[in-house]
Amino acid sequence: MPGKVQDFFLCSLLLCIVSAGWCG
């Protein structure tokens, strides 16, 4: 399921960016 993997990756990346924005 490449689509599911891509969605999970994008979600994780977005969460990482948001977390970095909050912490940084």
From Swiss-Prot:
One of its GO terms (biological process) is DNA replication. InterPro entries: RepA1_leader_peptide_Tap. Keywords: DNA replication, Leader peptide, Plasmid. Pfam families: RepA1_leader (PF08048). This is Positive regulator of RepFIC repA1 expression. It comes from Escherichia coli (strain K12). The lineage of its organism: Bacteria, Pseudomonadati, Pseudomonadota, Gammaproteobacteria, Enterobacterales.
